[in-house]
Amino acid sequence: RNLILATFGNDEALEILPLVDGLPNAPTDPPVISLVSAEHDQIDGFIAFSPVFPVSGSGVCGYILAPLAVLPAHQRQGIGSLLIKHGLTSLAERNADLVLVYGNPHYYGRFGFEGAIPEAFQPPFEMAYPAAWQGLLLDGGTMPRTPVSFKPVPALNNSALW
């Protein structure tokens, strides 16, 4: 909680904290994957990947990256990059097809996320910043022939987060 409060402004943190609190208790199959970075017994980074569930039964195994948080004093040191790379590797090993993210295109583009991919994956809510909706196909992942609607885990099923 302290990490989220320190990383995000108060208003944004108040929207994100229920997500962070709800993810560990999400009874999902496949499971939510959470990773932390710590230095001197202090958590300085956190990332979560939660599964998405296609409404149409397309068989796509996808995840959403949310949230990513790094203490402000520890940013620009590669912690976020390491968390993302480790998470993507873990998801590929679990045979996930794709990862979606709603975030800064310049930042996430460094890891291969593209704006064209999520055109095939419709978010559950209207987004304030549609250009921030991005996706990354993992090894073996393919684009569906028709757009796929999906449902996120309950903690992420909140229009304020979109």
Describe the role of every protein-language-model region.
Residues T7, S90, Y107:
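Short alpha-helical functional segments enriched in proximate histidine and acidic residues
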Residues E93-D97, Y102-A128:
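Conserved active-site alpha-helix within GNAT-family acetyltransferase domains
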Residues V20-N25, E119-P123:
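Short, solvent-exposed loop/turn elements at beta->coil junctions and helix N-caps
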Residues S34-V36, D41-F53, G62-A69:
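Conserved beta-strand in the GNAT
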Residues Q42, L71-L82, E93-R94, R110-F111:
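Conserved glycine-rich acetyl-CoA-binding loop
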Residues R1-G22, T28-I43, W133-Q134, D139-G141, ...:
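Short amphipathic alpha-helix that is part of the acyltransferase structural core
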Residues L65, V70, R76-T89, V101:
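Conserved acetyl-CoA-binding loop-helix of GNAT-fold acetyltransferases
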Residues F49-S50, L83-G87, G115-A120:
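Short acidic (Asp/Glu) patches
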